[in-house]
């Protein structure tokens, strides 16, 4: 059931016959009436705001899915916040790097099982179905998993979801580049970076001259802006000068990751 539609049917439901609404919402309504009858404004103000959430829980079939994806999202992002802090403080926190990376790998494996189960049952649910955060979580878990075959399997599914308005074009761009990177191919949209010997490198680009145009087409910022987030910069001229080194570092990275 569409989330926007829930807001409309909630008010219509107030006019339904007794018993048409589920038990918890019904109970809350009865409490509201009792509070009004007893002129207990304080109690009423505490109770009536609970009605909408109770109604949604009982009538939106996607509610359990949304709640599950919220937990998945928080696990996915929280462990990465911790990992990012370690990278920023390697001298003091570097000893935790290997264990946190292993924990993250385990989390990603667990999360992708949940997410692929949801996608296989419901299809790629859009924002109107489950909200923006849950929708993005579907993409994040496919993107972050270490299973290249699984990512390749879901690439055409997310492409179709983009065409149906159920996923963002940049989701497809990121996953496309990830699949190509893992296959040892140059990336298209410039979304993937690697770290070799403590330095961040772009994965080699298929078409550096047109990369910003391609990024613009999927709603991504210019590549130089993106790379500044890693403490690096990008220009076509700089890239072409360093291209042979970039390719060497990529080969080194592929070898170290058994690809």
Q: Which residue stretches match the model-derived regions?
A:
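A cross-kingdom marker for long, charged
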Residues: 203, 210-259
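Bacterial Sec-dependent N-terminal signal peptides
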Residues: 1-28
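Preference for long, solvent-exposed alpha-helical segments and helix-linker "stalks"
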Residues: 24-133, 145-148
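Extended, non-catalytic structural segments that build the interaction scaffolds
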Residues: 98-100, 194-203
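Stable alpha-helical elements in mature extracytoplasmic
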Residues: 28, 111-114, 154, 207-214
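Compositional signal for N-terminal targeting/processing segments
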Residues: 186-196, 216, 231-234
């Amino acid at each position: 059931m569409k989330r926007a539609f829930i807001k409309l049917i909630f008010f219509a439901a107030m006019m339904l016959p007794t018993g048409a609404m589920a038990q918890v919402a019904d109970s809350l309504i009865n409490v509201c009436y009792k509070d009004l009858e007893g002129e207990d404004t304080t109690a009423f103000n505490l109770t009536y705001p609970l009605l909408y959430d109770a109604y949604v829980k009982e009538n939106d079939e996607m509610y359990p899915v949304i709640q599950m994806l919220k937990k998945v999202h928080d696990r996915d992002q929280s462990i990465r916040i911790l990992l990012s802090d370690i990278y920023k403080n390697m001298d003091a926190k570097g000893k935790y790097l290997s264990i946190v990376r292993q924990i993250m790998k385990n989390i990603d494996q667990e999360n992708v099982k949940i997410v692929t189960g949801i996608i296989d049952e419901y299809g790629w649910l859009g924002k109107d179905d489950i909200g923006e955060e849950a929708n993005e979580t579907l993409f994040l878990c496919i993107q972050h998993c270490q299973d290249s075959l699984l990512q390749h399997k879901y690439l055409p599914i997310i492409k179709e979801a983009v065409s149906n308005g159920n996923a963002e074009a940049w989701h497809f761009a990121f996953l496309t580049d990830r699949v190509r990177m893992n296959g040892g191919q140059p990336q298209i949209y410039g979304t993937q970076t690697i770290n070799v010997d403590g330095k961040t490198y772009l994965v080699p680009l298929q078409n550096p001259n047109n990369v910003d145009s391609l990024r613009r087409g999927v709603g991504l910022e210019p590549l130089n802006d993106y790379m500044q987030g890693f403490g690096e910069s990008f220009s076509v001229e700089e890239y072409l000068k360093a291209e042979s080194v970039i390719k060497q570092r990529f080969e080194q990275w592929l070898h170290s990751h058994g690809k």
